Amino acid sequence: MSEDSQPRLLESDPNPGDRDLKAVNSNPSDNRLNNQSDDYEPEWVEGITLVMVISGITLVVFLMLLDMSIVSTAIPKITTQFDSLGDVAWYGSAYTISSAAFQPLTGKFYNYLSSKWTFLSFFGIFEVGSLVCGVANSSKMLIIGRAVAGVGSSGMMNGALSILAGAVPIKRRPTMIGIIMGVGQLGLVGGPLVGGAFTTYSTWRWCFYMNLPVGALVGVLLLFTRVPDQKPKQPAREVLRSVVLRRFDFIGFVLFAPASIMLLLALQYGGNEYSWDSATVIGLICGSVATFVVFGLWERHMGIEAMIPGHLVRDKIVFFSSLLSMMIFGFTMILSYYLPIYFQSVRDKSALVSGVDLLPNILCQLVMAVVSGVLTSKLGYYLPWGVFGAILNALGNGLLSTLSPTTSVPSWAGYESLVGFGRGAISQVPMIAIQNAVKGDDVSTAMAMMTCAQTFGGAIFLAVGQVIFAQTLRQKIPEYAPSANVDEIIAAGATGFRENVSAQNLPGVLAAYAKSVDSVFYLNVALSCAQFVFAWGVGWKSVKKEKQKDSEEEKVVESA
């Protein structure tokens, strides 16, 4: 190895010991690929090609996040058509469970196969699932479609960030991630608005059909556009023949998937279909814990070839970025579910109008996501945005916990806006931190870990929020409306209880609903405080340092 290549190896590989282990365990074709990677110069995308790439992956992230929340306002119509009230929980959990089970494995796909074609393959599976949901003629068919769409979504966020890593240098990524996440999270928070509009003025099936024409547009944007990879990749046929069985850790996947499914099923069943102390829920939790223990032992045995490598779990920035992402996504899911409940239950707004009432939050989040991304690219440091966003989130959710049936429009709009600014500032911080800290083969795997943490954060804290909401509501109704029938009100649902409550009891029931929503926002305050703590772990590093090093190397080469 030449003298001028040695510093480059040290800068680009934070785990040289792992590189040595890879060299020992690899076959000749792997060694050739490693040599190519050492000399590989990335091809950054510019101009109209960059616009097409960013537009394509932004639309995909938007659809993925939209699909998580759009079904919430369509569920009443779906259950009426299919007479399937008992399947309500599965319309959301089938998507989440299948996505979480596959997410860690997606890092391996993006490591060894073309990012563009892997991304389009996962997106294609997502589109097939959407089509099945749209044409479903039974509740079971709809659940199967949601599960297929979840499998497709498992590789979409990781793929979007992997493509971005190969398309633009690290200094420009904060701006691009700000745009992608700013627009993408419009789908998560605006899903109830879109779903309410389709359900009210057309049919719930368009909640899924809409993915198809947008998918065709994504195909036009990406299919014929050259998207460079972060590193040279072997031909797919050679990878499938010589790499998949040795490197993809399918045993780890076979252990991780059922462990995840059992945990998420326990969270789904607990307090809904079964009590938390039931044999079913306890059995699922115990089975999940035991399987996760076996999975951890297997991953330790596999070393650097593990689906979730130990050196990444021990990496402080990856670890804290994943935890931060979990807290962000958990509090975002709670916000997207319980603000509409406040507007529809307490303020008697329609599904469509309640979605419109979320606009202060949505627009402020979009503006701050773009502004923070641009300023991070200019100034270099992303940690301040994480701390600043966490503070705004804590303040905003603290104010949201004071909502009542008589809260004025300027007040709740201001509270929403504060949370929107906070979420916009912090959302992209974990992604930037990981892409800035992790290099080479580990980028896709680290991003898969982060997206998996996101999914678990959403599922776990949404379940905790549901427990808090249900228990508080059951306590507060007798307190504020002593003569009301608690079981009848709860069974009627968040929008149907008005038909079963007398005019005398209605103010008390509305106050009970408002207090129950407030109690869930206390959980969001706690998650925001956790964001503040974990944000300090993402590292005080600058995305501009890599560019400065590259410029110094170019000057050395020119002088030589």
Curated annotation (Swiss-Prot):
So what does this one do?
A: MFS-type transporter; part of the gene cluster that mediates the biosynthesis of oxopyrrolidines, polyketide-amino acid hybrid compounds with feature structures of tetramic acid.
Q: Which residues are glycosylated?
A: 35, 500
Identify its membrane topology class.
Multi-pass membrane protein
PANTHER family noted in UniProt: MAJOR FACILITATOR SUPERFAMILY, MULTIDRUG TRANSPORTER, PUTATIVE (AFU_ORTHOLOGUE AFUA_8G00940)-RELATED
CC annotations in GO = plasma membrane
Q: What is this protein called?
A: MFS-type transporter opdM
Q: What follows loss of this gene?
A: Does not affect the production of oxopyrrolidines A and B.
Report residue spans for region: Disordered.
1-38
Q: Does the keyword Transport apply?
A: yes
Q: Which UniProt keywords apply?
A: Glycoprotein, Membrane, Transmembrane, Transmembrane helix, Transport
Entry similarity comment: Belongs to the major facilitator superfamily. TCR/Tet family.
